A protein has these predicted regions:
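Walker B catalytic acidic pair
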Residues: 145
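Walker B beta-strand of ABC/ABC-like P-loop ATPase nucleotide-binding domains
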Residues: 142
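Active-site-proximal or metal-binding-adjacent scaffold patches in catalytic folds
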Residues: 1-139, 149-201
Length: 201
């Protein structure tokens, strides 16, 4: 499932945009609660369980420093990957059993160009960034990819399969997902630029 291919004209510098995005970064959905807090010590710490992340940043953390931004984005990616690996495959397996569908394997990837994909071999890839989305949209992407197990296209039979699994809400959910893609496009563009070629040590 491809995301909207938006190339926005940024009205502020990449560093300024990242500073604002990171200061206000929070996830509060039925699947995940992710909070950034500022502590009183000079060290970062993380409290993590499945469905919950609390990242305590060092006192005086400088959101405008490019190196700090890169570090924080990479930490966010690492934590989202952990959550996605523990939450998304079990949901996919549950839906597959419910609708009597058979897939091969599920992979969680750091991809922002699309939310998910299904190969002709029955392998399903899901973006770790799905953890940002509301539960109903996350489930929609999972069901969308499961529908491709029977229909490897986006024709009428495919949408009939999606509607079968979404109580005839396939097109409406697709529109909502496209709107969510628009809302996250600039953030993804900036985060990708800042972290390109870097990994956590």
């Amino acid at each position: 499932m491809e995301r909207n291919n938006l190339r926005p004209h940024l009205v502020m510098s990449m560093t300024d945009y990242a500073a604002q995005a990171l200061k206000h970064f929070e996830i509060n959905t039925e699947l995940l609660r992710f909070r950034l807090l500022t502590g009183t010590s000079g060290h970062a710490s993380i409290k993590r369980s499945v469905g919950s992340v609390e990242l305590m940043l060092p006192y005086g953390f400088n959101f405008s420093d490019p190196d700090r931004q890169r570090w924080l984005i990479l930490i966010i990616i690492r934590e989202l990957r952990f959550q996605a690996c523990h939450i998304l495959p079990p949901r996919l397996d549950e839906f597959a059993r419910q609708y009597n569908l058979r897939h091969q394997r599920t992979c969680i990837k750091n991809i922002t160009s699309r939310w998910g994909s299904c190969s002709s071999l029955g392998n399903i890839n899901l973006s770790l960034w799905l953890m940002l989305a509301p539960k109903e949209l996350t489930d929609y992407v999972i069901l969308h990819e499961l529908a491709h197990l029977n229909e490897m296209n986006h024709g009428p039979h495919f949408w009939a399969e999606v509607d079968r699994m979404t109580h005839n809400q396939g097109r409406a959910l697709e529109r909502e997902m496209k709107q969510f893609s628009l809302q996250t496009a600039v953030m993804f563009k900036v985060f990708n630029q800042i972290t390109r070629g870097f990994q956590l040590k």
